[in-house]
Amino acid sequence: MRLIILVISILISNAGSLLRSLEDDSNECMFNCPKRARNVSVPHTEKTCMGDDAIIAQILDGYNKLDLPGGGHVVVSIEIWVQEVSKIIEITSEFELDIYVTERWTDPSLAYSHLNPCKSNMSVDGATILNKIWNPHACFVNSKLANIHESPFKNIFLQIYSNGSIWHNYRIKLTGPCSSTLRTFPIDQQRCMLFYESFTHNTDQVKMEWITTVPPITILKGNITLPDYVLVDFSSSSELRLYPPGIFNELIATFTFQRLYGFYILQVYVPAYISVFISWVSFTLGAEQIPSRTTVGVNSLLALTFQFGAVVNNLPKTSDVKAIDVWILSSMAFIFASLIELAVVGYLSRDGQHGSIKCRCSWLCMNCKDWTALKIDQMSSIVFPVSFLAFNIWYWFIFLGKLLVRTI
C-alpha cells in the first residue's frame, strides 16, 4: 500500500515538473521563436534567375565588337518617327527637324536565353553599352548638321532581347537640304530629302532596309504645319549607291511641303490689284487734272515697286523667272501704260480742249475721226480693264496651270 502511494506521488511530482517546463518553453517561444524561425533555412529547389548586370557582364566577356554578327551580311531594319519640323529656311534651302531613328538587327553573340534570365529583354545604358557591341555605324550622309539630344541625358535607348535581337533608338535634331525651282512661287513646293546609310559597311557586309512590319516613317503629331508651309506628303525609298569602297544601301526619306500662299495673296496680289485699279481712276478725272492724275499714277507705281522689293528680299537669289515676278512686272506695265496714256492726253490738252490727233487713212480709202483727249480717256477706261481681265485669265488658268503640271 505504501508502495502504491509512493509511486503516485512520484508521478504527480514529475507531471508538475513537466507542466512547468512546458510553460517555460511557451514563454521562451513567445520571444525567441521568431528568431529561431529566421535562422531556419528552407531548401530552395528552383534555380535563381540571373539579373541584367550579371548577364551583361557574361555576354560581353570575350565579345569582339569588330566581328560581324553571324559571320556577315547583317540585315538592319530602319524606322523613323518624325517628332517635329521646326522650320524651313528658303535662303539656304534647308529644313530643320527632330526625329527618332530606330535600328534593329540580330547578334547571336548577345543571346542570353540559356542564362535563365529574369526577363526576356533588358534595357541598358545605350550611351555606354553601344560602344562595346557591334553596330552598323549608320548616319544621314547628306545632313548639314546632326546632334543627338542630351537633355537631361543623352537620348539613346538600347534594348537587348534574349534571342540576340537588338533594338537601338535615338533622338536627333538635324538640318537637311531641300530643293525647289521657285518657278511657281508663291504656289510652290519644297521637297526635302534625307539619305541614311551605313558609313563603314557596304552591301557585302550589311544590308540596310526599311522596316516592313510597320510604316517606315511615322508622323507623331498627325500633321505638321509651319507658318509658311504644311507637310502634304512623305515617302520612303531605297537605292544602291556606288562609292570607291563598294556598293552601299541608301535609304531615302522624302518630305514634301506645300507653301501656304495666303500671306502672299493678301500682301502682294491684293495690293497689286488695288494699285492697278487706282491707276484707272485717272481716266475719269479729265484732261484738266494732269498734276493729280500724275500723282495717282506715280504713287501706284512706287507702291507696287516697294512691295515687290520686300518680297524678293526674303527669297533666295535665283535666275528662274517666278510666277510672282510675271504678276508684279505685268501690273507695273499696266500702271506704266496708264502714265503713257496720261502723257498723250496731256500733250493733246496743251492747246486747249480742241487738241486732237490727226489720222491719215488715205491708204485705206476711208475717213478717220480725230482722237481727242476726252475720246482717248473714254477708250482707255474700256481697253485697260478688258486687257487686265484677259491677262488674269491667262495668268491664273494657263500660265500657272502649265507651270504646276511641269513641276509635279
Swiss-Prot record:
Broad class of where this protein is predominantly found: membrane
MF term (GO), any: extracellular ligand-gated monoatomic ion channel activity
Top-level lineage group: Eukaryota
Signal peptide feature range: 1-17
GO biological process: chloride transmembrane transport
Family in the record: Belongs to the ligand-gated ion channel (TC 1.A.9) family.
CDD domains with a match to the protein in the record: LGIC_ECD_GABAAR, LGIC_TM_anion
Transmembrane regions listed in the UniProt entry: 263-283, 296-316, 326-346, 381-401
Cellular compartments per GO CC: axon; chloride channel complex; presynaptic membrane
Topology, Extracellular side: 18-262, 317-325, 402-408
Name the UniProt record assigns to this protein: Acetylcholine-gated ion channel acc-4
Subunit structure of this chain's protein: Does not form a functional homopentameric ion channel. Forms a functional heteropentameric ion channel composed of acc-1 and acc-4. May interact with acc-2; the interaction does not result in significant heteropentameric ion channel activity.
Membrane disposition: Multi-pass membrane protein
Covalent S-S links between cysteines: C178-C192
InterPro entries linked: GABAA/Glycine_rcpt (IPR006028), Neur_chan_lig-bd (IPR006202), Neur_chan_lig-bd_sf (IPR036734), Neur_channel (IPR006201), Neuro-gated_channel_TM_sf (IPR036719), Neuro_actylchol_rec (IPR038050), Neurotrans-gated_channel_TM (IPR006029)
Alphabetical UniProt keywords: Cell membrane, Cell projection, Chloride, Chloride channel, Disulfide bond, Glycoprotein, Ion channel, Ion transport, Ligand-gated ion channel, Membrane, Signal, Synapse, Transmembrane, Transmembrane helix, Transport
Pfam families per UniProt: Neur_chan_LBD (PF02931), Neur_chan_memb (PF02932)
